[in-house]
Amino acid sequence: MALWILVFIAGCIADPGLHVAQSRNILRGDQERKSLEDETNKLEYRITNTWDSIQVIHEPVTITFKAGDGGLIMEVNSLYFDDPPAPPGEPGLPFDGLWDYEVVEAFFLNSKTKEYLEVELCPHGQHLVLLLSGGDCFAKGLDLDFKADIHWNKWNGTALIPWRYFPPGVDKMNAYAIHGSGIGRTYEALYPIPREEIEEDQGPNFHCLEYFKNFSLKWIMGENWEQPASDLWP
């Protein structure tokens, strides 16, 4: 079975076929990868910077998106930092405030309406799903089929995000990873804020929507796919 690996520089993936002929020349420093096997597509992202555009010095967190039964599969492969300790919640259930623990997050945005979905996944099995409009959360704690496993110093997790959770017309995304405690708390971003745009005393803010970059569910599902209607969005 033929397997084609097409690699894209982060932020330049607006046209899935744009860099086919040039793919051999842009393997270094890529944050996004699109793999095609017959008609099954997947997108792979690597978080290589902190929120303020400093390169991470550990193995990057990898997030993979692919088609699932009734939704989008989100796979996480990451180092396990074991800091902070596990949240005091039951694995497999939503946990409010999960962003204060070790977590990997993905945001899916409609840049015109400013409506977006936030999905947070924890190595200990807890999760948190939030629906937001203009930065205001109007629904959270939605159910999610999510399983996570820790193997020594690494963890992996798989979640199935139902289509009804996505706002109509998703065209941008970003992803984040957080770990550590106190002054060692580390905030990493797929698409960080450029160093020259950071203001004095500015801290991490994952809701800076202007730094999200192009994303389409059709890159995974196919150009003829239509997003199912949702009862959760106006």
What is each stretch, according to the model?
Residues I9-G29:
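N-terminal signal peptide
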Residues L93-D145, I150:
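Extracellular/luminal beta-rich ligand-recognition
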Residues M1-L6:
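Classical eukaryotic N-terminal signal peptides for Sec-dependent ER targeting/secretion
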Residues S78-D96:
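Short amphipathic, basic-aromatic surface patches that mediate peripheral association
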Residues L144-G182:
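Extended, acidic-biased charged interface segments
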Residues F65, G70-P84, W155-P162:
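Short, well-ordered beta-strand segments enriched in hydrophobic/aromatic residues
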Residues D30-E37, F95-V104, L109-Y116, P168-P234:
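Acidic/polar low-complexity flexible segments
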Residues H58-V61, G68, H151:
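N-terminal intrinsically disordered, cationic/polar leader segments
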